[in-house]
């Protein structure tokens, strides 16, 4: 069977390695640097919807139910939706002389509270929702349906949960033809590659971390032994306030920044193949092996938070604070059962 063009090219590159010039090690560094200079300063966001989404909207209004507690999800450190002290039915009626009173995990809520406010119409609003504010909230409503009728009482319960975006990151693996495994040139190349990748995603408030780097001798099919570097690295998003540039708005979502970083890194490795394919001189001793870049999308929750599509169907990809009776001690995905846990956001089972 006739070999494909990429296979023929790779075999040609391997034969050319034997004739590599003494300057080839320096050439690969220059090659990588040139690729970074060729990379565009910005790449458009993916058109697909982000894996995470915000439930917190200032315009949203949530009504209660007389039959069961209503779940409310508020992103950590963000403003909450308006939690109304009425049912959907009462919202469409006039209420005469209504009186509202809210109680939370720390007792009665007064309108003068700086973090949790009760509006003149009885709505509960949080300006900067903290983890410790998660819990059961109860509203007591007194009203008359009409002036002539007697006072009626209604009690509505809400369970308000803090939630956060998952700790998304991409894990990449890539292979390079290498110098002998005991060569210092491999170590030098590794450092340079990480510097270039880090610079590539710096303006996106993302960081590159090397997870593993190994050198192995590989027996090729119908060929001899060759040295290869196996790189495993991750790309994760930083808090926007920790990045080099201020960021605000919808474009700052970690999933969007990571998608853009992924595109830049994939383009960087593709350009290495393109540049090597156009070279007339012998190949450098260390170079990327076409087709070996692999990527896996990984998400984790912060300690004290977890995902549960059955318990939180309205926020399936959110890391919701662990309820009493559960905990998450590490950056796992789910809250685990712990009967001795009595608080929201438990990070240990004591």
Swiss-Prot record:
GO terms for biological process: acrosome assembly; binding of sperm to zona pellucida. Residues 1-38 form the signal peptide. The keyword Glycoprotein applies. InterPro entries: Ig-like_dom_sf, Ig-like_fold, Sp38-bd, ZPBP1/2_C, ZPBP1/2_N. Glycans are attached at residues 113, 186, 339. It comes from the Eukaryota. It is a peripheral membrane protein. Keywords: Cytoplasmic vesicle, Glycoprotein, Membrane, Secreted, Signal. Its main location: cytoplasm. It is found in: Cytoplasmic vesicle, Secretory vesicle, Acrosome; Secreted; Cytoplasmic vesicle, Secretory vesicle, Acrosome membrane. GO terms for cellular component: acrosomal membrane; acrosomal vesicle; extracellular region; zona pellucida receptor complex. Belongs to the zona pellucida-binding protein Sp38 family. Plays a role in acrosome compaction and sperm morphogenesis. Is implicated in sperm-oocyte interaction during fertilization. This is Zona pellucida-binding protein 1. The gene is ZPBP.
């Amino acid at each position: 069977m006739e070999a494909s063009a990429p296979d023929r090219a790779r075999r040609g590159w391997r034969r050319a390695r034997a004739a590599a010039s003494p300057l080839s090690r320096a050439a690969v560094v220059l090659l990588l640097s040139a690729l970074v200079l060729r990379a565009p300063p910005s790449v458009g966001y993916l058109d697909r919807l982000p894996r995470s989404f915000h439930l917190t909207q200032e315009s949203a209004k949530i009504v209660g139910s007389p039959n069961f507690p209503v779940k409310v999800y508020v992103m950590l450190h963000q403003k909450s939706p308006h939690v109304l002290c009425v049912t959907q039915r009462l919202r469409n009626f006039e209420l005469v002389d209504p009186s509202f009173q809210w109680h939370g995990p720390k007792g009665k809520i007064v309108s003068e509270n700086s973090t949790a406010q009760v509006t003149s119409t009885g709505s509960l609003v949080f300006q900067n929702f903290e983890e410790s504010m998660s819990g059961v909230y109860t509203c007591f409503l007194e009203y008359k349906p009409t002036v002539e009728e007697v006072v009626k009482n209604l009690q509505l319960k809400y369970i308000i949960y803090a939630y956060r975006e998952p700790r998304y990151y991409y894990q990449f693996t890539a292979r390079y033809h290498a110098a002998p495994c005991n060569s210092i040139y491999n170590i030098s190349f590794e450092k340079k590659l990480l510097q270039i990748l880090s610079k590539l995603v710096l303006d996106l408030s993302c960081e590159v971390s090397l997870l593993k780097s190994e050198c192995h001798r590989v027996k090729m099919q119908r060929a001899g032994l060759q040295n290869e570097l196996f790189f495993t690295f991750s790309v994760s998003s930083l808090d926007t306030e920790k990045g080099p540039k201020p960021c605000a708005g919808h474009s700052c979502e970690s999933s969007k920044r990571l998608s853009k970083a992924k595109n830049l890194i994939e383009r960087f490795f593709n350009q290495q193949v393109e540049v090597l394919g156009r070279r007339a001189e012998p190949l450098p001793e260390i170079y990327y092996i076409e087709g070996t870049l692999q990527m896996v999308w990984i998400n984790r929750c912060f300690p004290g938070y977890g995902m549960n599509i059955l318990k939180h169907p309205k926020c399936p990809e959110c890391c919701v604070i662990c309820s009493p009776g559960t905990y998450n001690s590490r950056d796992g995905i789910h809250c685990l059962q712990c009967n001795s846990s009595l608080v929201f956001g438990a990070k240990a089972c004591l």
